Amino acid sequence: MTKFNFDQVHSDIQFKIKHLMVSQVKGTFKQFDVQLDGDINDLTSLKATATIIPSSIDTQNEDRDNHLRSNDFFGTEDNDKMTFVTKEINENQVVGDLTIKGETHEETFDVEFNGVSKNPMNGQQVTGFIVSGTINREKYGINFNQALETGGVMLGKNVKFEASAEFSIDN
């Protein structure tokens, strides 16, 4: 079994959502952790648990971030974490249970395994994954929206995300 050490400094979670039917708002979560277990030589053996702290949301606008922390969206006073627990990983996809605001649904996302490399700064082996996909926020009770007088709604229901996770490897 390979020992993986999560490297948050070289990892991130970014998202975007349609805004006013004409543009998009982007953001990130600053606090998260990924536990990874299994054999790096057998991707199907890997099991991961990602924990995201929704109160760490950052869209570069404090008023918007505070609204996103409110009960209209993440309700961070009552919901201090979101989790994704894998059930199956292969070279192209990851299937797992995503929990947001106490709602759990199985989701399938794209995954890109970036191989193993040696860090020239410290000689340590590292590996990384990029996971991306689309989440229907309404499935998780995040329903806030407003109708526009020109038609359509203020916010899209689908949130696109990309998460990049890097790990050092101890053999």
From Swiss-Prot:
<dbReference type="Pfam" id="PF04264">
    <property type="entry name" value="YceI"/>
</dbReference>
<dbReference type="InterPro" id="IPR036761">
    <property type="entry name" value="TTHA0802/YceI-like_sf"/>
</dbReference>
<dbReference type="InterPro" id="IPR007372">
    <property type="entry name" value="Lipid/polyisoprenoid-bd_YceI"/>
</dbReference>
<protein>
    <recommendedName>
        <fullName>UPF0312 protein SERP2314</fullName>
    </recommendedName>
</protein>
<comment type="similarity">
    <text>Belongs to the UPF0312 family.</text>
</comment>
